[in-house]
């Protein structure tokens, strides 16, 4: 019997490409994580709009990135390096089946950058304007950043700046290329669209607008953390390598370092944020801990193979510790209503973590590398600010960036999409009632539970249990048990002064940290 002859290179390539496919699917699973995280941090009347934007980010984004984005990245890489470029070659992946796995891996990163923006502009941006920006960030803004870095452009070792300094920009899995790009773009969008109604008082003081579900926000955070292993560990794309003797070598040490630093950064960020929020508010806040966990991950995303394990722990802790101060600076000083705190979580943490890589590098400190890191962070941020401002301004000119005041008050679910994620809060459709019409709240009208028909249990009069105050059971009408103060079950609890608070903790917030 002739022994089976196997080419080690073929085996290694096959295993590595299967690995890339698997982690690409894992990174895709971050999309529902983003959807849940953002949905939990907005009010119930805007959840459908959040879900629509997140689905659009992916569905439209992959089409644009396939037709345009990936090619733009290659062209920018050639334009900003001595190598030059060929337009036809830049788009050759479209017809090359051998390049499609690599394209998919790049696409899931591009979609992440786009999705981050949604959380900053939630609850007031016109959907058409958002679609324009989503298409542009995946087709042009992010691909330019990719071209400057990962596609061999300006900041890479072979790019003009990298060659001049003798070192290339270090960002392993996209702390700045993906996350800071998305976070800065979100900040620009939030500034240009303006704050939500009621977000700031007459004298400019912060007025928290709590989201409707801490549960969804934390669940989304944990799903994102799970997908992040694909993001970071998956970027270590070589699982098997060939040796000089023709054998195969498992790259366990490299994979292990990335996995360990990712995990330590995640944990350190969460604990640091818990400590800071406790010091700031007097009690540990679950949402701030969730934000710190994500910020810790962002902070180490660019650093995971380059720093020591303890360096990763420190970077993660820094990322988590600065989330609350960065958010408060954004809201209190800049007066920007960043609903989900994406600039603090993705922008600031990504910039700090990537800039400090040389300080904790495995090979020791390098001043030249530090210069490159700081320059790279600045260049990426500057490009993102300018490009995003132009696109948002253009979209605003054509469509208007913001929905009407009436639509914002009613909720974007009804105004933009004609749906409600929680129909029991607002009544059902029926022959005499349009979809989304609120159930009556005028002290004697009908309680409806059957799509529009009247349900009465006392011969026609309203059910009363408190000597005259109305008790309603349709998930959105007023329940009165105290002689006058309204208790609502549609996400807001209203006290004597009409200010919405959260149950059990009137300073807690679930909208990215909007605490007094």
Curated annotation (Swiss-Prot):
Q: Where is this site: Twin-His motif. Important for optimum substrate conductance?
A: 179, 346
Q: What is its main location?
A: membrane
Its ancestry begins with: Archaea, Methanobacteriati, Methanobacteriota, Stenosarchaea group, Halobacteria
What is the official name of this protein in its record?
Ammonium transporter Amt1
Annotated region Disordered: the residues are 426-516
Q: Which InterPro entries match?
A: Ammonium/urea_transptr (IPR029020), NH4_transpt_AmtB-like_dom (IPR024041)
Q: List the disulfide bonds.
A: none
The similarity comment for this entry is: Belongs to the ammonia transporter channel (TC 1.A.11.2) family.
Give compartment(s): Cell membrane
Q: Which organism is it from?
A: Haloferax mediterranei (strain ATCC 33500 / DSM 1411 / JCM 8866 / NBRC 14739 / NCIMB 2177 / R-4)
Q: How does it assemble?
A: Homotrimer. Interacts with both GlnK1 and GlnK2 after ammonium shock. Interaction is rapid, reversible and dependent on nitrogen source.
